[in-house]
Amino acid sequence: MNTISSLETTDLPAAYHIEQRAHAFPWSEKTFASNQGERYLNFQLTQNGKMAAFAITQVVLDEATLFNIAVDPDYQRQGLGRALLEHLIDELEKRGVATLWLEVRASNAAAIALYESLGFNEATIRRNYYPTTDGREDAIIMALPISM
């Protein structure tokens, strides 16, 4: 059974473990700790009591930015990322947020397809933004209009 709840400070070690497993260039523990507080809307998705995914989002006035989302590799391809994003979008709409922004690696075709299926559109590209093992790659900036 899947449950979505707030990502609390006490949940950060489990989220950090997922971050390490899910991303080739993961955030540091310090970055994780600094993305908590009242201006953040952070969620976790647990499956049978174990954290399987998380999302970290900053809300400023009527805009939000999804800073990080990850699904544990053992739980990928089960629709958990979609469920977490749909929950986030619903919560942002309740708060009157007009636009949700995110950036994604140009090579992350699965994530781009998910975002597009939820209504995100490409806004711009940041050239050579992300590090790779052999250089840099572009970030695609995407936006989802939520409410007016």
Swiss-Prot record:
Q: What is its EC number?
A: 2.3.1.266
Chain residues that bind acetyl-CoA: 69-71, 108
- The active site of this protein is located at 103, 115
What residue stretches are annotated with the N-acetyltransferase domain?
2-147
- Which catalysed reactions does the entry list for this protein? N-terminal L-alanyl-[ribosomal protein bS18] + acetyl-CoA = N-terminal N(alpha)-acetyl-L-alanyl-[ribosomal protein bS18] + CoA + H(+)
Gene Ontology MF: a single term = protein-N-terminal-alanine acetyltransferase activity
Q: Which InterPro entries match?
A: AcTrfase_RimI/Ard1 (IPR006464), Acyl_CoA_acyltransferase (IPR016181), GNAT_dom (IPR000182), RimI (IPR043690), YpeA/RimI_acetyltransf (IPR050680)
Q: Name one GO cellular component term.
A: cytoplasm
Keyword tags? Acyltransferase, Cytoplasm, Transferase
Q: Where is the protein found, in the record's own terms? A: Cytoplasm
Q: What is its main location?
A: cytoplasm
Report whether Acyltransferase shows up as a keyword of the record: yes
For this chain, the family text in UniProt reads:
Belongs to the acetyltransferase family. RimI subfamily.
Q: Which PANTHER family match?
A: ACETYLTRANSFERASE (PTHR43420), PEPTIDYL-LYSINE N-ACETYLTRANSFERASE YIAC (PTHR43420:SF51)
Role played: Acetylates the N-terminal alanine of ribosomal protein bS18.
Name listed for the protein in its UniProt record = [Ribosomal protein bS18]-alanine N-acetyltransferase
Organism of provenance: Escherichia coli O157:H7
Species classification = Bacteria, Pseudomonadati, Pseudomonadota, Gammaproteobacteria, Enterobacterales
The UniProt gene name for this protein comes to rimI
